[in-house]
Amino acid sequence: ISSVRLDFAGDLSRDEGERPARLAALREAWGLPVGQPFRQADWDAATQRVLDALSAREYAAAAITDSEALIDPATASAALSVTVDSGPVFRFGPLEITGLVDYDRSLIERYRPPTPGEPYSQERLLLFQNALQNTTYFASVVVDIDRHSATPEAAPVRVQVTEAKPRRVGFGFGVSSNPGYRVEPSYRDAHFFDRAYNLVSGLRIEQRRQLVYADVFLPPSLDGALDSVGVLAEHTNIAGLQTQRQSIGVVRTLPSGNIENRFALNYQHEAL
C-alpha cells in the first residue's frame, strides 16, 4: 500500500465538540496502513469496520459514498481512498409498535425503551430488543429505527413483535430409587387474568411425596421492580412419617446496575 486517503463528510466533518476527537480515533483505527501488503479481503474488512464504527453511535445513516483502490502493476503498489458521509446526528423518537394482539403497548414500555431525545446507539437498541426477547410474551422481536427518517432528531423506534402462545401445558414422568415414580403435569399462562401476569403452576406426584404449587410473576414496573407471589402445599410419607407443609410468599426484586436486590416475605406452616 503506497498511500491512504480517508475523507469524511456530513455532520461529523464539522470542527465542533467531540467531532475532531472522534475523527482522529477513526483514522487511528484504520486497519490498512501504508507499507502493508494489499489484499482485497483486508480492504473490504477495513472499509466495513469504519462504517460500522461510525453507524454504531449517533450516525445511523452513515454510508460510504466513494471507495477506490488503484493498483499499479508496474510498481506493485495500491493507492487507497475512501470517503464516508456520516449523515446527520440521529436521536431516538417515539415508539412505533406492530404485531400486538393480546397485549397492550404499555407492556413493551415497561422494558425500558430508548427515551425520546436520547442519542442513537445500536447497543441501546440491542439491549431493549434482548430485554423483550427474553420474556415469555414474545416469540420474536425486531427493534430498529427509521434510518431514512425525515426527522433524524426524533427518528421513530420501530418495534416489530410476534406474540408467543400465552398458554402451555406440560407433562413429565420419571422413576428414581428414592422417591420412586414421579408424574408432573404443569400449566403456564403468560396472560393470566388478561393482565400479562405470568402464571407458572404444577402438580408433582411421587410415590412418597406430593406437591402442588403456583407462582405468579408480574411484568416489571416502570422503575424496573419485579414482583411475584407464590403458594405451595406439600405432603410427604417417608419411613412411616407423614408431614404436611403449606407456604405462601411474596418477592420484590430491585435491579441496581449489575446487582439485584431481592426482598422476600414468606409464611410457612408445617405439621406432622
Task: Please give the residue ranges for each predicted region.
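Gram-negative/organellar outer-membrane beta-barrel architecture
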Residues: 13-25, 118-272
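Interaction-mediating elements
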Residues: 1-157, 164-166, 180-182
